[in-house]
Each structure stands twice: as C-alpha cells, then as structure tokens.
Amino acid sequence: MEDFLLSNGYQLGKTIGEGTYSKVKEAFSKKHQRKVAIKIIDKIRGPEEFIQRFLPRELQIVQTLDHKNIIQVYEMLESTDGKIYLVMELAEGGDVFDCVLNGGPLPESQVKALFRQMVEAIRYCHGCGVAHRDLKCENALLQGFNLKLTDFGFAKMLPKSHRELSQTFCGSTAYAAPEVLQGIPHDSKKGDIWSMGVVLYVMLCASLPFDDTDIPKMLWQQQKGVSFPPHLDISSECQDLLKRLLETDMTLRPSIEEVSRHPWLAST
C-alpha cells in the first residue's frame, strides 16, 4: 500500500479515521505540495452489497460535487490488490463531534455560522439531485471557521422525474428520522433535514435530543417532541427551527429551501 502511494507521489502519515471497510490517513502530496487525506477502501473485505451498490454510487457522486462546504476529492486511484484510494482535501480542525465532546455546547452565534454552511452544502446537494443519507457530527469537518461535509458512502442520486421513496436504512441510528427507523417508504431529502436537526441540537446542547440506546423508547420520545435544557438559554427562533427540523411527520418537515429562509438563519 505505502509503495503504491509513494509511486503516485503520496507520503503516508497517521490514521485519522476508521470505518467498517475503510480508513482515512493523513498524507503529503508531492504533486499538490500540501497535506491531504486519503480514504482507503478495501474492496476485498467489503460485503457484496457495499461493493456492488454503495461504493459505485459514492465514487460517482464525490467526483461530481464541487462546493466550498464539501470536502473536495482531488484524485481516485485503484491498486491491483483491490484497494481504492480517494485523495481528498484535509480538514485539520477535526470534526464537530470531537469539538463538542472536548469543549461542550457551542455558543449559539458560532453554531449559527456553522449550521448556515451545512445548509448551503445540503442545498447544493439536493439541487444536484443528491441525498447524503448519513449526516452526523462526525461527518461535518472543521477547517478554521469553515464547515465541510464528508463521507458520501450512503449517498444516493435521486430520480428527477418523480419523488423518490426509499425503504433503505442508511446512516446512524441517533441521526435517523423516525420513518427511516420504522422502514416506512420515505423521501431521502426529508431524512437529511431530520439529521440536520440532530446535528444542530448536538452543537447547541452537547447531547443527543433522543436516547438512541433503546429504539422503541427513542421513537416514543420523538413523537413527544424535542425539549431543551433551560440553562442553555437557546433563543426562541432557534428552538422554532429545531422543532421544524425534528418534525416526526415527514410531509410537514421543511425542504432545504424552506430551512434556508428560516428567520433564525436570516438574522445576524
């Protein structure tokens, strides 16, 4: 692996992330003269559904997206031993999860600045006909004051002719919309909106809005609605947006265009 990457001009560094069938390593690119991140996907270790269905989608989608709030893919390489290497932009500030884990709840003004960028990224994706389907704090990377989305491993191109309804469970339980958890045919874009609500809540409260250790209990909590720790003094406009994002009825949940026009995001 190291020899293959060296021959392509990349000096491997430390591991900065690990998934089920992949890992992400820091590297130095001689070609770009800067640090990069390399996602290494092992096709041999992955199950057939992942190799035949999800991986080709990810590779197709990441090469078409181009937005300042989405991690850029510079190059894709494949070695003879069944490994795929995605050479990507490196966000050196870590992810939102670690930021909140180490520092606690973020100030509302900082959360607004970051969340606006997530809204812009998802607005772009949905406009391109792409649903991310795995939005979570770990997939929101930080580069200074900039937020950049990554990991399109569960992403899907949506048909333009009619509204897409999916029954596939993707992503992480804690961030999954109730219709996804229940296996109800659903609109993947509306699933992204719910997940954004969970990310927003975590940034503000440094905790999950619902208990993900017990799925039936979590579904009951979701129906009851989200509550806010009073000591954090979250503004009424922000609470209103969160309640709209975490609307259990997906037909009432706003589109990304409607989210972008919400008063909380419009105000300075």
Where are these regions (language model features)?
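Glycine-rich ATP phosphate-binding loop
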Residues: 23-44
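Conserved N-lobe beta3->alphaC-helix segment of eukaryotic protein kinase catalytic domains
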Residues: 40-65
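A short, aromatic-enriched beta-strand patch in the conserved N-lobe beta-sheet
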Residues: 75-77
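Conserved short submotifs of the Hanks-type protein kinase catalytic core
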Residues: 82-95
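Activation segment signature within eukaryotic-like protein kinase domains
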Residues: 114-115
